[in-house]
Amino acid sequence: MEISHSLFIAFLLFAVVMFFTPGPNNIMLLSSGLNFGFRRTIPHMAGVTFGFAFMIAVTGLGLGAVFTTYPVLQTVLKYAGAAYLLYLAAAIALSAPPDPDAADRRRPMTFLGAALFQWVNVKGWVMAIGTITAYAAIASYPWNVAVQAALSLLFGAASSASWVLCGTSLQSLVKSPRAVRAFNIAMGVLLVASLYPVLHEP
């Protein structure tokens, strides 16, 4: 397997920008870190990391070509995913802070839920298709898909952990129920805002 070093470095820079900048996954992980802590968010992190790497692999092995051949499918997925993200944004914004005098019935997102979410994550699809098409020549097929999926797994894990840690670090600052509610509303608004650049992609 021969790897193009110039494309490899370019892909690393692309991955840093795409994985670590705010998007639906990162905003939800930040919110979960504040509301549930690092340990309880681990299944959510793992679902995002493995779910997206799997999506990269499947896209590279042929699913991306289906969307290229039938662009209407990508359009349908884009708006269906946007509708689901709006639902999640409302759920986060309206979530009540924990009541210290009652059992906390809230639950963080599960591994399966986070993994399945990748398939309706609009930014995720833009990243997956862009990654596979722009950096297809990083190595010969199918090694190019393996390299991209492996790097996505690595960067996804680092990005997910860093955003959850940011959320947990805010626990000492966002203590009162009013502050938690304001934070959740802000995260819901940011989640909606993250849809704007993706929905305006041609």
Model regions and ranges:
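Alpha-helical multi-pass membrane helix bundles of inner-membrane/thylakoid proteins
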Residues: M1-S4, T75, Y87-V126, S172-A186, ...
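Transmembrane alpha-helical segments of integral membrane proteins
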Residues: A157-S172
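Hydrophobic alpha-helical transmembrane segments in multi-pass integral membrane proteins
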Residues: I56-G60, W119-G130, V189-P202
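Juxtamembrane transmembrane-helix termini in multi-pass membrane transport proteins
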Residues: E2-T75, G130-L151
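Hydrophobic/aromatic residues within the transmembrane alpha-helices of Major Facilitator Superfamily
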Residues: V16, F20, A53-F54, A90, ...
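Membrane helix-loop-helix hairpins that form the core translocation module of multi-pass transporters
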Residues: I42-T110, C166-S169, Y196
